[in-house]
Amino acid sequence: MTTRLLQGKKGLITGIANNMSISWAIAQLAKKHGAELWFTYQSEALEKRVKPLAEEIGCNFISELDVTDQKSISNLFNDIKEKWNSFDFLLHGMAFANKNELKGRYVDTSLENFYNSLHISCYSLLELSRSAETLMHDGGSILTLTYYGAEKVIPNYNIMGVAKAALEASVKYLANDMGENNIRVNAISAGPIKTLASSAISDFSTMLKFHASTAPLKRNITQEDVGGAAVYLFSELSKGVTGEIHYVDCGYNIIGSSKLL
């Protein structure tokens, strides 16, 4: 690789659950482009999956992060300040919903699931961005992951669609708040892709087939497709881009009707 777009940059990567995670694909490509990375994991159970991945690409920093625990967030950023002093980009890659409610009717969403889904999937972006802002001394890039179900009704996506809609609105408001410090905030709206999280969605295989048959490129996206877009949004190539929802969905979002009968 002759051009290393992230050479000399440091980045915090959240949301890795296993080697099928979009966050992992982004991390791999960021590393290839010269970035020094810091991984987080949600729990001890996930540490067993994430630690070998960190070792695989030479990531020397890995920390537990529970975004529902303010102390956990503070500990992470205190460690980053101590080890790095500052850093350049953040990937917000986590989301949550009770899998038992990723089917049936949205109107049956429980209050507990509504609260937890919005807290982990959306409010955590605010908390991480607030902490990251103090350590992005020379500006930076914050990136999150969303999906078309934030804009249009997708069967069984339910509360996650509402959480992603809130996330996308938050991207715009955060971009406005943080722009004065030369911090850019964007989201990638990725097409459906097989991950640990997506496996919880009822009839997900049907969603994949419909997407591939409808999208102009006639295929589903890959983790590498998203990774390439992420590297662009982390790099100086996108220094004039903020507050954007960047589609990586093989063109699916432009289609009004797949076929006329």
UniProtKB/Swiss-Prot annotation:
Superkingdom: Bacteria
Residues reported in the UniProt entry to bind substrate: 97
Pfam families, A to Z: adh_short_C2 (PF13561)
Name of the protein described by the UniProt record? Enoyl-[acyl-carrier-protein] reductase [NADH] FabI
Gene Ontology molecular function terms on file: enoyl-[acyl-carrier-protein] reductase (NADH) activity; identical protein binding
- The keyword Lipid biosynthesis is annotated on this UniProt entry: yes
Which pathway does the protein contribute to? Lipid metabolism; fatty acid biosynthesis
For NAD(+), which residues are the binding ones? Answer: 15, 21-22, 42, 66-67, 94, 164, 193-197
List cystine links.
none
Catalytic activity annotation = a 2,3-saturated acyl-[ACP] + NAD(+) = a (2E)-enoyl-[ACP] + NADH + H(+)
* Annotated SUPFAM superfamilies: NAD(P)-binding Rossmann-fold domains (SSF51735)
Q: What is its EC number?
A: 1.3.1.9
Q: Where is the active site?
A: 147, 157
Q: Which CDD domains match?
A: ENR_SDR
Species in which this protein is naturally found: Rickettsia typhi (strain ATCC VR-144 / Wilmington)
Q: How does it assemble?
A: Homotetramer.
Q: What does this protein do?
A: Catalyzes the reduction of a carbon-carbon double bond in an enoyl moiety that is covalently linked to an acyl carrier protein (ACP). Involved in the elongation cycle of fatty acid which are used in the lipid metabolism.
